[in-house]
């Protein structure tokens, strides 16, 4: 019987042990590398996810704004066939509004507002001008549309309703019915839907001249929930800068039926009444932005220029 080579056996055992240890160490290293790679991948994924989420959040914040400051301005150059008030009053060319300064709202600043909710801020068809702050809340801006409009919310030459077909001291029943609807302008906002109608002096009565002198109380008027805008008031117009007032020269003027309306309704009553039906104020053209009283008969018509009220937090200015 052969004796075991103890020395050789011992060496073999050591070698096997070293190999086993090496394999274990390599396994641990590989496991660590895999874990490290997974951890790195997870970290990268987490950072990318957070970054993308932040970017998307910022995009949503920006796109959720109702109005953005305009980058270009509307202008008009008169020709021999021009029929707007500015041109028929002897004008040659005009630029409407101003681009303004970042972080500051100035009367006449131009904005593009996504009132129809399609995600686009169309400078041609969704142009508005800042007028002033809402009297009851300085955190809300009052903006006026660039042109006359009808219920569909688009530029309209033919929309020219009476203020109120029966009398002018009961509120803008007929004029308000021709304002853009909430279906046409779903993103437009009004925070002052119900308010007192005043005369030009801030009073709440008018004098009607009949066979005797009669005093009529002006109503607290509520615009229908189906309309997305309101009419401008005499006081708001008087607070506008010349640049802002000149925006009303767009698409106003002429007395021919195919011309643009020669006046734009304001929701302010004439204190002295103006006959048995009463009268309200209107922006009159072609004598530029002159204020006049209308109507001479209840059915006399003017254009409507929609006004919206937008929280300043909903405006990118």
Give residue ranges: language-model regions.
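N-terminal leader/signal peptides at the extreme start of proteins
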Residues: 1-9
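Aliphatic-rich helix starts adjacent to a transmembrane/signal segment
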Residues: 31-51
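N-terminal single-pass transmembrane signal-anchor helix
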Residues: 9-31
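Collagenous Gly-X-Y triple-helix signature in extracellular proteins
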Residues: 63-317
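Hydrophobic/aromatic hotspots within intrinsically disordered, low-complexity regions
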Residues: 43-45, 60, 73
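N-terminal low-complexity, intrinsically disordered "leader/linker" segments enriched in small/polar
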Residues: 47-65
């Amino acid at each position: 019987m052969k004796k075991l080579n103890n020395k050789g056996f011992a060496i073999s055992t050591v070698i096997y042990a070293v190999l086993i240890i090496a394999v274990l160490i390599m396994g641990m290293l590989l496991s660590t590398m895999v874990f490290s790679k997974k951890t790195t991948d997870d970290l990268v994924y987490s950072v990318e996810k957070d970054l993308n989420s932040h970017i998307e959040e910022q995009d949503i914040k920006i796109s959720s704004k109702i109005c953005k400051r305009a980058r270009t301005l509307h202008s008009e150059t008169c020709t021999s066939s021009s029929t707007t008030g500015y041109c028929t009053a002897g004008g040659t060319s005009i630029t409407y509004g101003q681009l303004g300064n970042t972080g500051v709202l100035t009367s006449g600043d131009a904005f593009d507002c996504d009132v129809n909710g399609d995600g686009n801020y169309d400078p041609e068809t969704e142009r508005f001008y800042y007028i002033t702050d809402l009297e009851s809340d300085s955190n809300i801006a009052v903006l006026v549309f660039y042109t006359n409009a009808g219920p569909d919310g688009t530029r309209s030459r033919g929309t020219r309703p009476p203020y109120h077909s029966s009398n002018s001291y009961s509120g803008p029943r007929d004029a308000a019915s021709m304002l853009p609807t909430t279906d046409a302008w779903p993103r437009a906002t009004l925070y002052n839907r119900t308010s007192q109608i005043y005369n030009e002096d801030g009073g709440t009565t008018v004098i009607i001249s009949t066979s005797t002198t009669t005093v009529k109380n002006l109503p607290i008027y509520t615009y229908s929930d189906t309309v997305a805008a309101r009419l401008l008031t005499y006081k708001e117009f008087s607070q506008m800068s010349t640049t802002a007032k000149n925006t009303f020269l767009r698409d106003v003027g002429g007395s021919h039926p195919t011309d643009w309306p020669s006046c734009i309704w304001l929701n302010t009553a004439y204190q002295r009444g103006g006959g048995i039906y009463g009268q309200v104020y209107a922006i009159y053209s072609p004598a530029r932005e002159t204020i006049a009283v209308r109507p001479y008969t209840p059915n006399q018509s003017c254009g409507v220029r929609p006004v919206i009220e937008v929280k300043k937090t909903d405006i990118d200015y």
